[in-house]
């Protein structure tokens, strides 16, 4: 028995050593990439963040990301609720379609939007003042298409993990589905919803593939921070590109920290199903 226990401990120690070694390798790989951006971006950082084109790109990125995230959350909340709390028709097919969108290349999503808004319907919208192709409005549309499935998944997971017994009790006492949603489900998932909003905003800030396909990158018109990096690399201005990348890295780090702090449950930890 003692010999069997010793062999089991050796196997466990070997497995632990392999997993720790793999984790350290992954951390080193990711840390090297982050360090390369920081080291290369520091020399020109102060000058770059004061340049007119980077300031324009920063303002446009923050504005479009904020607008698109508000729209995404407004659409994702009822969609996630319908997928988790109702018997909507084709619910399984709808969920699979949303998951499929997550696996598609962003440039393909941008191409689909370009086809839609270059169609007669898109031209009609343009004639009536809603121009999307090669305009800042197109950036918002690209962000919405890319991030909406992601937000739906986050919110859907939060809704599925919430304790439904409280909603059942409220409904037996005469509460409407809207009342249960507003007074029970949203407060229970407040931390997860806050994290979903912040992470969706961060993804919108860094989105580039769909935006490039739909609106292109033009200085002082459709130039976001990722677009600014792209233009700097295209013109051989690598120091400015790395400094801009460092700025995006700092913003991403701050948003991640904010999501960790604000995304905590008001009860100290997230409620688990059945507890």
Regions from the language model: what does each represent?
Residues 210-236:
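Glycine-rich helix-loop "coupling/hinge" segments at transmembrane-helix boundaries
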Residues 89, 176-177:
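Short coil/turn motifs that cap or connect alpha-helices
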Residues 8-43, 52-160, 188-208, 232, ...:
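Membrane-water interface segments at the C-terminal ends of transmembrane alpha-helices
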Residues 173-174, 187:
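Glycine/proline-centered hinge or cleavage motifs at structural transition points of membrane proteins
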């Amino acid at each position: 028995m003692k010999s069997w226990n010793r062999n089991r401990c050796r196997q466990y120690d070997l497995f632990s050593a392999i997993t720790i070694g793999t984790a350290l390798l992954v951390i080193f790989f990711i840390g090297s990439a982050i360090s390369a951006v920081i080291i290369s971006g520091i020399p020109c950082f102060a000058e770059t963040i004061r340049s007119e084109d980077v300031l324009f790109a920063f303002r446009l990125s923050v504005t479009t990301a904020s607008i698109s995230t508000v729209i995404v959350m407004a659409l994702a909340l009822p969609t996630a609720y319908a997928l988790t709390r109702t018997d909507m028709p084709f619910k399984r097919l709808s969920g699979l379609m949303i998951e499929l969108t997550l696996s598609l290349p962003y440039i393909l999503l941008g191409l689909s939007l370009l086809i839609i808004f270059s169609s007669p319907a898109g031209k009609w919208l343009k004639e009536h003042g809603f121009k999307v192709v090669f305009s800042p409005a197109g950036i918002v549309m690209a962000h919405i298409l890319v991030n909406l499935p992601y937000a739906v998944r986050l919110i859907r997971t939060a809704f599925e993990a919430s304790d439904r017994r409280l909603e059942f009790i409220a409904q037996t006492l005469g509460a409407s589905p809207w009342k249960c949603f507003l007074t029970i489900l949203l407060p229970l998932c407040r931390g997860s919803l806050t994290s979903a909003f912040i992470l969706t905003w961060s993804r919108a800030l860094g989105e580039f593939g769909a935006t490039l396909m739909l609106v292109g990158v033009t200085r002082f018109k459709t130039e976001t921070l990722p677009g600014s990096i792209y233009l700097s690399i295209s013109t051989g201005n690598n120091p400015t590109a790395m400094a801009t990348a460092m700025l995006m890295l700092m913003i991403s780090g701050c948003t991640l920290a904010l999501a960790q702090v604000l995304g905590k449950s008001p009860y100290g930890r997230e409620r688990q199903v059945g507890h």
